[in-house]
Amino acid sequence: DPVQLSGTVVKRATLNNADMMAQMDIRVGDYVYVEKGGEIIPKITGVELSKRGADVVRPVFPTTCPDCGADLVKEDDEAKWFCPNVDGCPTQIKGRLVHFLSRKAMNVIAGEATIEQLYNLDLVRTPADFYDLRKSDLLRMEGWKERSAQRFLDSLKDSLKVPFERVLFALGIRYVGE
């Protein structure tokens, strides 16, 4: 239930990962203690065990990728679980394509819906594929007309002028950030 905390109504609180939930022994239906980290972000700091019901259960986390079905893995020194199917998981491929075109990366005018259509039509699988697109490819897409296709192609052409550090960021290399 929402609670009043430092002058604001809090409906959700950060817990970060399954390891923290296990360490704090948090279960579905528990009453928890919440505080604001840095006076901004609500976070769970503990469990009120005296209010724990007999019917509470530990949360169950997915063990396989919901998109491609690969078994999730976890690096020893990290908290998050992830899909290792880098080259075959559609969600990961599309995510990398969205990142590549994003404003902070190549700054191409395109949204997730555009990338979804391009992916579903088998027109793009890698960032390089964007630069092979022709206007006729784009006009095959639902809702695309001459003007929108030309704007997208012009935006792609303009992206060839971004500074190298943004290209490097756009490639999405692990541990390489802005």
Region spans (language model):
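Structural signature for extended repeat/solenoid scaffolds and their inter-repeat hinge/linker regions
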Residues: V32-E178
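Conserved nucleotide-binding/hydrolysis modules and their immediate coupling elements
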Residues: D1-D55
